[in-house]
Amino acid sequence: MAPPKAEKKPASKAPAEKKPAAKKTASSTDAKKRTKTRKETYSSYIYKVLKQTHPDTGISQKAMSIMNSFVNDIFERIASEASKLAAYNKKSTISAREIQTAVRLILPGELAKHAVSEGTRAVTKYSSASN
């Protein structure tokens, strides 16, 4: 048997009691202050690209989290592959050449071609701006 249902009573509208504010000493607040750790994400950049391609489309927090994880994963794969390539060639520095080769190895076909051309364009733009 199911337990009998309790009768619903309207919530009372009485104001909540105000408690006196606790006095804080300078030493106790300084010891408990914590700086909020910053979480670095690509959210603002993903949002800008979304608005360039689809101005009237939004993105949910969960979808943004998935996109952020995707970007982190791709960057990690490229960096790892570029690191291996530098080690094979007995170099201690990852250059644009290693990144380009890593992109060609990781991304498939046409996507790799577009990524390489956009990357080359970005590096050229950066180089001309810094001169």
From Swiss-Prot:
The modification Phosphoserine is found at S12. There is a cross-link at K8, K9, K18, K19 (Glycyl lysine isopeptide (Lys-Gly) (interchain with G-Cter in SUMO)). CDD domains: HFD_H2B. SMART domains: H2B (SM00427). Residues 1-20 have a biased composition (Basic and acidic residues). There is a cross-link at K125 (Glycyl lysine isopeptide (Lys-Gly) (interchain with G-Cter in ubiquitin)). One of its GO terms (cellular component) is nucleosome. Pfam families: Histone. It comes from the Eukaryota. The modification N6-acetyllysine is found at K8, K9, K13, K18. Its main location: nucleus. It is found in: Nucleus; Chromosome. GO terms for molecular function: DNA binding; protein heterodimerization activity; structural constituent of chromatin. Monoubiquitinated to form H2BK123ub1. H2BK123ub1 gives a specific tag for epigenetic transcriptional activation and is also prerequisite for H3K4me and H3K79me formation. H2BK123ub1 also modulates the formation of double-strand breaks during meiosis and is a prerequisite for DNA-damage checkpoint activation. Keywords: Acetylation, Chromosome, DNA-binding, Isopeptide bond, Nucleosome core, Nucleus, Phosphoprotein, Ubl conjugation. Belongs to the histone H2B family. The nucleosome is a histone octamer containing two molecules each of H2A, H2B, H3 and H4 assembled in one H3-H4 heterotetramer and two H2A-H2B heterodimers. The octamer wraps approximately 147 bp of DNA. Core component of nucleosome. Nucleosomes wrap and compact DNA into chromatin, limiting DNA accessibility to the cellular machineries which require DNA as a template. Histones thereby play a central role in transcription regulation, DNA repair, DNA replication and chromosomal stability. DNA accessibility is regulated via a complex set of post-translational modifications of histones, also called histone code, and nucleosome remodeling. PANTHER family: HISTONE H2B. This is Histone H2B.2. The lineage of its organism: Eukaryota, Fungi, Dikarya, Ascomycota, Saccharomycotina.
